[in-house]
Amino acid sequence: MGHLLMLWVAAGMCYPALGASAWSVNNFLITRPKAYLTYTASVALGAQIGIEECKFQFAWERWNCPEHAFQFSTHNRLRAATRETSFIHAIRSAAIMYAVTKNCSMGDLENCGCDESQNGKTGGHGWIWGGCSDNVEFGEKISRLFVDSLEKGKDARALVNLHNNRAGRLAVRASTKRTCKCHGISGSCSIQTCWLQLADFRQMGNYLKAKYDRALKIEMDKRQLRAGNRAEGRWALTEAFLPSTEAELIFLEGSPDYCNRNASLSIQGTEGRECLQNARSASRREQRSCGRLCTECGLQVEERRAEAVSSCDCNFQWCCTVKCGQCRRVVSRYYCTRPVGSARPRGRGKDSAW
């Protein structure tokens, strides 16, 4: 594989040990032709990118995107269509599409390359299509084949999962931007050559996190949920899917209480979690994480002071090294702890992922 994959291999991420992503890829290989082996490394990379981005986006939330959640999202016994599951399906589908598209454009995969279908055509006043456009069509095709094939159900939950898979792929399409290069005498830029390029995946993660924050709950009664693949079950859900919602994340069921430990749902609770307080570079939401993770879950915020060592007083020495000293300083870190003698923390119950 090429540069994109090598970056992750250099970071110590070996594909046979990718955990949740490898689990999903293995599920796919059971039912797919051996020809698709060509793309499994790129798909596994994409799945891992999705996991890491999910962890980043939810690092300071009560539900912090544990890696096992990516396994549970395809496990028949644990197929709850919650707000969190909607994000998992979307980010995984988007990340796989992203990784395959980038590897394709770099020439790392067989049977695909840059999208040159528009090259030479006039795109607008003063510019023409050219260069190497990212092949999002191919990336979307492979993502759909891999991810959607994991959904074996035919009930309302399955349709919701497939909808969110597609919303993730639409997020990748929404991130494409036109990049141009000037041509002309003495840099006059009399004409430009332009191509389509995917944005950094962090932008897609931010986009999908915003979709998660305002995800739409589809109201269905228990009779409709049990309808399975009967006509009334499919029709009831189809009626809810208006064209305007195709890029939105949707869910059916409220979230469990993420404040408290629940072994049956593999929820660890927030006790022992670190939170941010007085951090200058933190966002407003991150600044409020101690209240969200600790106080609102019936826990207290405990300050722990520790010595941190960092490089400082660096000087360039001829030739050609940089020598640094070591500086020590005391830093404060904050954790959610249970008050002495208190009972189990009490959270807000349903929809308490915030």
Curated annotation (Swiss-Prot):
The keyword Disulfide bond applies. Residues 1-19 form the signal peptide. It is found in: Secreted, Extracellular space, Extracellular matrix; Secreted. Coiled coil: none annotated. Palmitoleoylation is required for efficient binding to frizzled receptors. Depalmitoleoylation leads to Wnt signaling pathway inhibition. It holds the Pfam family wnt. GO terms for molecular function: signaling receptor binding. Induction: By retinoic acid. Glycans are attached at N103, N262. Forms a soluble 1:1 complex with AFM; this prevents oligomerization and is required for prolonged biological activity. The complex with AFM may represent the physiological form in body fluids. This is Protein Wnt-8a. The lineage of its organism: Eukaryota, Metazoa, Chordata, Craniata, Vertebrata. The gene is Wnt8a.
